[in-house]
């Protein structure tokens, strides 16, 4: 599936005293992009939760390449790297909308559980 990248315009409050985006915001943007991805492929978080399924984060990583500044627009390409019905790994590639410069790459790992915390196979 070829999805349009998720787009995030950097807000002033996301920057730190050094004038660059604080590193923790990249993880938030990854979550925004993941929610977008899940909706686009027909598995919105709302739908999963309505069906009694939760999807906790079991791991996250982000490699920062270039600083991001206020007023930049970040494109986040999201793709499924691994999925076996119980666990899933999502890959994120964050680039500058105007220049294509690579800002960061990241991954998040998730599992699917019922509300009692037992694994659920979505396949």
What are the functions of these language-model segments?
Residues 1-59, 114-123:
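Hot-dog-fold acyl-thioester-processing enzymes
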Residues 2-6, 39, 67-70, 81-123:
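HotDog/MaoC-like acyl-thioester-processing domains
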Residues 37-83, 87-88, 105:
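Hydrophobic beta-strand-centered segment that forms part of the acyl-chain substrate-binding groove
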């Amino acid at each position: 599936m070829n999805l349009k990248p998720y787009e995030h315009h950097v807000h002033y409050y996301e920057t730190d005293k050094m004038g660059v985006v604080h590193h923790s915001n990249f993880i938030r943007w990854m979550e925004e992009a993941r929610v977008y991805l899940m909706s686009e492929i027909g598995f919105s978080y709302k739908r999963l939760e309505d069906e009694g399924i939760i999807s906790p984060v079991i791991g996250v990583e982000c490699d920062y390449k270039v600083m991001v500044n206020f007023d930049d627009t970040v494109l986040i390409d999201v793709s499924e790297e691994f999925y076996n019905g119980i666990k899933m790994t999502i890959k994120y590639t964050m680039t500058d909308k105007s220049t294509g410069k690579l800002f960061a790459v990241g991954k998040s790992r998730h599992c699917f559980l019922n509300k009692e915390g037992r694994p659920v196979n979505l396949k």
